[in-house]
């Protein structure tokens, strides 16, 4: 593994190895406290962040490395100077680049013109670090993730894409339940389906919540993706039937709940569920750090 732009670039064994390493780092942090000693990692943010920034900054520190934070004060990458020059300069100073960007093309430019590993910490198409944290969380409750049935409910987006691709590679069943007109990208769904054929997994897209009865895990996200300035009130009528609430859990028999956050309580998910016995949401947030640490350790070993 030279970079992490999308989980579709990883094999099943590579994903399983990352999950195993994340568990090892989580269980024995002292053993890895100097694993990145002498390493400097530039973290770039074109978009706002809480979980991504804090988990990367603290995670890198816990591994003995040094994180350098760059925000969008100089504009998006490629505006003040070319992506080529930006990547070439950063590569002379840093050991890796972690980038949360508006466009996936920016990440491809960083890889093309840089000479250090690049990690996608979110873009318009994918959110691979989130998906790895999600399946790390799932694997803590299900010994064989290939037998897990995961339902994503809401708007098809970058998180949906990465969940589908990761589940497909691992051999799990992943269903995206989205209102009509809000399905995930058709080309990425096609890619996930092709990967599932190889692994024995299954990828589905539906608008019917009855299709996820007896699933294991349900996953929510905001109804309006970051960068979309559509008022929530405008989409509330469309998405409200897909709210993750106690009634839906009882109707489907689903045991565990995930949400990548930030969450709009009483909209896509109720507080009763988010704070309830079925919720793994804050374990999931913690696991962002451990999954990302595993990625950095693998890239910089």
UniProtKB/Swiss-Prot annotation:
Domain of life according to the entry:
Bacteria
Spell out the molecular function terms from Gene Ontology: amino acid binding; ornithine carbamoyltransferase activity
Functional pathway: Amino-acid biosynthesis; L-arginine biosynthesis; L-arginine from L-ornithine and carbamoyl phosphate: step 1/3
Residues at which L-ornithine binds: 158, 221, 225-226
Activity versus pH, per record:
Optimum pH is between 9 and 10.
Where in the cell is the protein located? Answer: Cytoplasm
Binding-site positions, carbamoyl phosphate: 100, 127-130, 260, 288
Amino-acid biosynthesis: present as a keyword of the record?
A: yes
Reported temperature dependence: Optimum temperature is between 23 and 25 degrees Celsius. 37% of this maximal activity could still be observed at 5 degrees Celsius.
Which keywords has UniProt assigned to this entry? Answer: Amino-acid biosynthesis, Arginine biosynthesis, Cytoplasm, Transferase
EC number(s) given by UniProt: 2.1.3.3
Q: Which InterPro entries match?
A: Asp/Orn_carbamoyltranf_P-bd (IPR006132), Asp/Orn_carbamoylTrfase (IPR006130), Asp/Orn_carbamoylTrfase_sf (IPR036901), Asp_carbamoyltransf_Asp/Orn-bd (IPR006131), Orn/put_carbamltrans (IPR002292), OTCase_ArgI (IPR024904)
What's its catalytic activity?
Answer: carbamoyl phosphate + L-ornithine = L-citrulline + phosphate + H(+)
What processes does the entry annotate via GO biological process terms?
Answer: arginine biosynthetic process via ornithine; citrulline biosynthetic process; L-arginine biosynthetic process
Activity regulation reads: Inhibited by excess of arginine and by the bisubstrate delta-N-phosphonoacetyl-L-ornithine (PALO).
What NCBIfam families does the entry give? orni_carb_tr (TIGR00658), PRK00779.1 (NF001986), PRK14805.1 (NF011380)
HAMAP family the record matches: OTCase
The subunit structure is: The enzyme is present as a mixture of trimers and dodecamers, with the relative proportions of the two forms depending on the salt concentration. In addition, the trimeric fraction could reassociate into dodecamers when the salt concentration is increased. It appears that in vivo, the main fraction is in the dodecameric form.
Relate the protein's function as given in its record.
Answer: Reversibly catalyzes the transfer of the carbamoyl group from carbamoyl phosphate (CP) to the N(epsilon) atom of ornithine (ORN) to produce L-citrulline, which is a substrate for argininosuccinate synthetase, the enzyme involved in the final step in arginine biosynthesis.
Record-stated family: Belongs to the aspartate/ornithine carbamoyltransferase superfamily. OTCase family.
Q: What is this protein called?
A: Ornithine carbamoyltransferase
Gene that this polypeptide is encoded by: argF
């Amino acid at each position: 593994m030279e970079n992490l732009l999308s989980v579709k670039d990883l094999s099943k064994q590579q994903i399983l190895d990352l999950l195993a390493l994340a568990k090892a780092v989580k269980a024995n942090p002292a053993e890895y406290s100097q694993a990145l000693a002498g390493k400097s990692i530039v973290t770039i943010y074109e978009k706002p962040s809480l979980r991504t920034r804090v988990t990367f900054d603290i995670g890198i520190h816990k591994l003995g490395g040094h994180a350098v934070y760059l925000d969008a004060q100089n504009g998006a990458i490629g505006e003040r100077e070319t992506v080529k020059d930006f990547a070439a300069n950063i590569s002379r100073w840093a050991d890796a680049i972690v980038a949360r960007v508006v466009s996936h093309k920016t990440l491809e430019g960083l890889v093309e013109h840089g000479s250090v590993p690049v990690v996608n910490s979110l873009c318009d198409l994918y959110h691979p670090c989130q998906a790895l944290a999600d399946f790390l969380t799932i694997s803590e409750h299900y010994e064989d993730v290939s037998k897990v049935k995961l339902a994503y409910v809401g708007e098809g987006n970058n998180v949906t894409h990465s969940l589908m691709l990761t589940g497909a590679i691992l051999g799990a069943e992943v269903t995206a339940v989205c209102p009509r007109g809000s399905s995930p990208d058709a080309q990425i769904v096609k890619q996930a389906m092709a990967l599932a054929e190889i692994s024995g997994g299954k990828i589905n897209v539906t608008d019917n919540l009855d299709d996820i009865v007896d699933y294991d895990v349900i996953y929510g996200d905001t109804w309006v993706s970051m960068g979309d300035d559509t008022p929530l009130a405008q989409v509330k009528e469309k998405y409200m039937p897909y709210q993750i609430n106690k009634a839906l859990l009882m109707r489907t028999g689903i045991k565990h709940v995930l949400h990548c956050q930030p969450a709009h309580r009483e909209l896509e998910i109720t507080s009763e569920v988010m704070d309830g016995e079925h919720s793994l949401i804050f374990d999931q947030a913690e696991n962002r750090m451990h999954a990302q640490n595993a990625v950095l350790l693998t890239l910089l070993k």
